[in-house]
Amino acid sequence: MGLSFQHILILLVVVLLLFGRNKISDLMGDFAKGIKAFKKGMSDDEVETAKSDSIKTIDNTGKPTNVQANPQRQDSTV
């Protein structure tokens, strides 16, 4: 048993009576500002990611170096 059109209409009337028309419009305006701020933050993050990806390039034209991970130590005491 789900919500019918009559149930939804009654809920809307009760919400309008409880909050009033001005309060609901203020809430919807705040909700819209939140969505805009979220979208702006997501687009700013994508721009920063694109900038950081272009900066992190490695030029592999140098000579390779041989590095020994665990060099053996030579003890001078016998």
Curated annotation (Swiss-Prot):
Compartments, record wording: Cell inner membrane
Name of this protein: Sec-independent protein translocase protein TatA
NCBIfam families xrefs: PRK00720.1, tatAE
Subunit structure, interactors included: The Tat system comprises two distinct complexes: a TatABC complex, containing multiple copies of TatA, TatB and TatC subunits, and a separate TatA complex, containing only TatA subunits. Substrates initially bind to the TatABC complex, which probably triggers association of the separate TatA complex to form the active translocon.
Family of the protein in this entry: Belongs to the TatA/E family.
Segments traversing the membrane: 4-21
Cellular component terms per the entry's GO annotation: TAT protein transport complex
Key words of the record: Cell inner membrane, Cell membrane, Membrane, Protein transport, Translocation, Transmembrane, Transmembrane helix, Transport
Disulphide connectivity of cysteines: none
Function, in words: Part of the twin-arginine translocation (Tat) system that transports large folded proteins containing a characteristic twin-arginine motif in their signal peptide across membranes. TatA could form the protein-conducting channel of the Tat system.
Molecular functions per Gene Ontology: protein transmembrane transporter activity
Region (Disordered): 49-78
